[in-house]
Amino acid sequence: MKLTKWALPLFFLLFYLLPLDQRPLWSPDENRYAEISREMVSTGDWVVPHFLGLRYFEKPIAGYWFNSISQQLFGDTNFAVRFASAAATGLSALLIVWFALQLWQCRRKAFLAGLIYLSLLIVYGIGTYSVLDAMVTLWLNAAMVSFYLIRQEGPLRTRVAGYLLFGLACGMGFLTKGFIALAVPVIVIVPYVIYQRRLPELLRFGPLAMVSAALLAAPWAIAVHLREPDYWHYFFWVEHIQRFAADNAQHKAPFWYYLPMGLLGTLPWLGLLPGALRKGWQDRKISPETLYLLAWVVLPLLFFSVAKGKLLTYILPCFAPLAMLLAASAVDLLKEGKERAFRVNAWLNGLFGLICLAVLAVLALSPSHAVYGEEDHGALAVAMVIFAGWALLGFIQLKDVSRRWTLSALCPMVLAVGLPWALPQSLIDSKLPERFIEANQTVLMDSSSLLANDVGLASSLAWGTRRSEIQLFDSKGEVHYGLSYPDAKERYVTRSDFPAWLAEARKNGQVALLLKTDKDGSTGSLPPADETIVSHRLTLLVYHGAR
């Protein structure tokens, strides 16, 4: 696959932007961020984040701002919900290309670094998914690039400006996802400058970065404190200390969690990884930029591995430098006429596709592990075509691997194009309730009261009906903090209180209760509904208004 100056923009357009609107929003993450920004736009409150009309202090404000601006530009669409993540990923790729050009003065290495980055499975998955990680990764990439460039010798004015710019990037990262955006640069840069014996320079100019970051964040930080004095207490202790270090941390996982997840995320370039890391380690003493890139990959990975709370999205900042190391190693191997790593990579992609095909066959033929039901024959066929295509793209490289090895970039793109049509109905109802809500839009819009027993379902209801006043039934979930305020007490209904609450609510009109049930479909002891609509694990109970 020949690289041209239009390859990256075309790749980004075809595989990032065009598919954004094709699949429903995933619950709970995408619905949550869609609804928070929709409420921000509709209420005009750009200071205090609200979710389902409740105070929601899980993240700072900048990510919501970008999502809200996207909705103002593109409307209440799935494209708008995901656009900020995709745009941030595209900008990160451009930054990688530019930085690689500065380091190596080699256009091929630079463009390959951008292509590899955009086609990494983890980057594509997060970059087309509405979470804040792609945005904070952009700011971290900008911070790390700016610091490396200003560490070089230059005029005092240039260094001062560079450190101020570094601080602004860190400040934007902080406004997007909090203190973690300050921790990542520190854990990479401090050991690096100590190793380079340049700590005095960092101590001299570092305060400039701290000042610029503080000045950027201060207006909103002060404004939200004046509006909600408890914001910073909750955000710091609960969302940072408990999430990452406490014994009851969210998303607890073992130390080695990121090893298999990171390797999987490196597809479709996994075969090039050992050689790239080995070459980087060998060149660390003669190549300061290689040492910097290695530190940028390894130290954040170790930091997040030590933390008790783990999510795959946390390690996204490690993949920009990894893409650059992979690209540099690949070009050097081609110059030396070495094809082994490319053949291994082609075989790995081919085998990965075949393994996924085998797993699909087991899921289709084994009743005890059935995922695809009788109504899912079309979806199963699409899924098999996807992984057959992945395998084919791997194996066809073997005939002329030195010319065809970049075809690996297309492997995840087959998945990207076909995924919306490859999902079984059970998964759609469980994780993409948007379609069920759309199918029952008339009933829901005619209801004066809407309830849900799951926060993800509630956010889907709010987004689908453009109403934020969804009642939480029998489960507080992640909005338990917002529900603890006196002005939000009536937003939660217990199962024992529901009959009395329902009798009163029906005086004002129809009531709709959306439930996510267990596999047996049981809704528990509830008043009999006038209408019951069931699809797999989703049950909609409709109570007509009292006459």
Curated annotation (Swiss-Prot):
One of its GO terms (cellular component) is plasma membrane. It comes from the Bacteria. Keywords: Cell inner membrane, Cell membrane, Glycosyltransferase, Lipid A biosynthesis, Lipid biosynthesis, Lipid metabolism, Lipopolysaccharide biosynthesis, Membrane, Transferase, Transmembrane, Transmembrane helix. Its EC number is 2.4.2.43. It is found in: Cell inner membrane. The chain crosses the membrane at residues 1-21, 83-103, 111-131, 174-194, 205-225, 253-273, 286-306, 311-331, 346-366, 378-398, 408-428. It is an enzyme of class 2 (transferase). Disulfide bonds: none annotated. Pfam families: PMT. Pathway: Lipopolysaccharide metabolism; 4-amino-4-deoxy-beta-L-arabinose-lipid A biosynthesis. GO terms for biological process: lipid A biosynthetic process; lipopolysaccharide biosynthetic process; protein O-linked glycosylation; response to iron(III) ion. Belongs to the glycosyltransferase 83 family. Catalyzes the transfer of the L-Ara4N moiety of the glycolipid undecaprenyl phosphate-alpha-L-Ara4N to lipid A. The modified arabinose is attached to lipid A and is required for resistance to polymyxin and cationic antimicrobial peptides. This is Undecaprenyl phosphate-alpha-4-amino-4-deoxy-L-arabinose arabinosyl transferase. The lineage of its organism: Bacteria, Pseudomonadati, Pseudomonadota, Gammaproteobacteria, Aeromonadales. The gene is arnT.
